A protein has these predicted regions:
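Bacterial N-terminal signal peptides that target proteins for export
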Residues: 1-6
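Bacterial N-terminal signal peptides
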Residues: 7-15
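A residue-level marker of the well-folded mature domains of exported/periplasmic proteins
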Residues: 19-212
Length: 212
């Protein structure tokens, strides 16, 4: 995600910190993410910008095999005295307890990249995922008019996944209904697992006699 989008987060943080002579806030960042290379890079961008603004940052990465849950990570960050929690949830549907605890402790919550639905979110920074899906689907159908298509929809617990998929299918679905395109794979990938995605795609290709 471009640095200019990350800068939106710090505009919010500056508002939270108040006037120039007010103490700078401590920021907690909780990544409940998979194996994508983007996350360590974005962690670096956030920490670099926070340092430039004189802010203290504590970051937690929470993957599927972590001994602690993301909720535990967030509770510990909140209890450490942060002013703002930047939350990239693994499962946006299970973030309500985190939001409630943050509100109780008067900690502002910024939902980043993955939308969290709830009245206790103070700010969301991300893209219009549905429109991105529309662009992907349109580009695909401009280049491919017929044949076999495999779609991996991402993690079903990420609100971005169905939005991206639904946007893309606006252009793809008519070709499927006409029989021009045949869907040989159309499944979610739990936890955005790279290994699982490889296995699913390999199995689909083999079952379809390597025709894709």
């Amino acid at each position: 995600m471009p640095k200019r989008l990350l800068c939106c987060i710090f505009l919010v943080l500056m508002c939270v910190s108040g006037c120039d002579d007010a103490p700078k806030p401590k920021i907690g960042i909780s990544f409940g993410v998979g194996e994508a290379k983007r996350w360590p890079a974005e962690k670096g961008y956030m920490e670099e910008r926070a340092q430039e603004l004189g802010m203290e940052v504590e970051t937690r990465f929470n993957k599927a095999d972590a001994p602690k849950t993301q909720m535990q990570d967030c509770f510990e960050l909140i209890d450490s005295g942060i002013s703002v929690l930047i939350l990239i949830p693994r499962d946006a549907r299970k973030a309500n307890e985190i939001l409630a605890y943050a509100k109780k402790k008067n900690v502002k919550v910024i939902s980043y990249a993955r939308a969290v639905m709830g009245e206790d979110i103070d700010f969301f920074v991300g893209y219009d995922t549905y429109r991105i899906g529309q662009s992907l689907g349109l580009h695909l159908t401009e280049k491919t008019y017929k044949g076999n298509l495999a779609i991996l929809k991402g993690d079903k617990n990420d609100f971005n996944s169905p939005l991206l998929y639904d946007g893309a299918m606006i252009s793809i679905r008519p070709l499927v209904e006409r029989g021009a395109i045949h869907m040989i794979l159309d499944e979610y990938v739990n936890g955005w697992s790279v290994d699982l995605a490889k296995r699913m795609l390999t199995d689909a290709i083999i079952k379809n006699d390597y025709k894709i």
